[in-house]
Amino acid sequence: MQVGLAAIFFGFLATNVVFADDSEGWQFVQENGRTYYKKGDIKETDWRVIDGKTYYFDYNGEMVVGWQYIPMPVKGYTIGPYPNGIRLEGSPMPKWYYFDENGVLQEFVGWEELELKDSLTVGKKHGEGWEGPEVLKLAYYYFDQDHSLKTGWLYDQSNWYYLAKKGDSGNKNLGGERRVGWINDGSAWYYLDSETGIMQTGWKQLGNKWYYLRSSGAMATGWYQDGSTWYYLDNKNGDMKTGWQYLGNNWYYLRSSGAMATGWYQDGSTWYYLDNKNGDMKTGWQYLGNKWYYLRSSGAMTTGWYQDGSTWYYLNASNGDMKTGWFQVNGNWYYAYSSGALAVNTTVDGYYVNYNGEWIQ
């Protein structure tokens, strides 16, 4: 069969134009601004291969162009409109295909940059007049071996990509386009390179914030251990936290690198102790390195005189460790028991200390 196309374009066409004829009497005909493939009054519908090119004619026999959501023919099945809009068991599922301005199925396989699939470019018929946008929006799409459009996750040449699905969060288009930036596939957040669309993993700085993307690409939240170092990533937004953070009824300090601090930490002129394993800020009496320290409710290490109930203690002015035995402060001698409690109104080693604990010579 040889069927030639003449003067076909995506726009208005003259009516009742016979484009070509063949020995069986089939011909392309333009009627009422639409294009049909007819033999007498019989209009072809569904898929048709004409002169080696594939076309699709809808249930009215109108030839389609642009983006179309239609079933691909499967051997042994008759393709047509679903009764009452219901797909019969065993009939092929519809897929997305792209037809050029002449109605020819584009037998794409792999990546193609095409007009954006949206309400302006979907479901058009050959000869249908419409005014597209002044600036054509383009997007990258991926086509399978049967020339149908793929959606969802795609693994191609050692990289992962995400091809939008209709109804995806934050996506107003009809799906299939290669996404970039942040996307949520319904299970987790992912970041796709802003230019290539390749799924990112590992540490990633975006704007002024850091994020960690697991080997699966999923954005990490909450506590995350990298080697021997712990980090905290916002439980909702995933951005890495720094500075003081109150988490689960405990305070933590995260350095400018995001690494959780442990052990002694100096903030300005104040010292704090952060659990050597868990990193939570300690308060109250703490026995560290064979010495006692007192950390206030704020976590700040106490120095100098400290009263606990009716008992006084003296904590070294320079390093905060609790004094025991005889010690001197501002020219006065004092005695603290092994518990650290200051001796008052008593005699120690033959020396009398008054109600302030001062040795009276």
Protein language model features and the residues they cover:
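Extracellular adhesion/carbohydrate-binding repeat motifs centered on closely spaced tryptophans
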Residues: 1-361
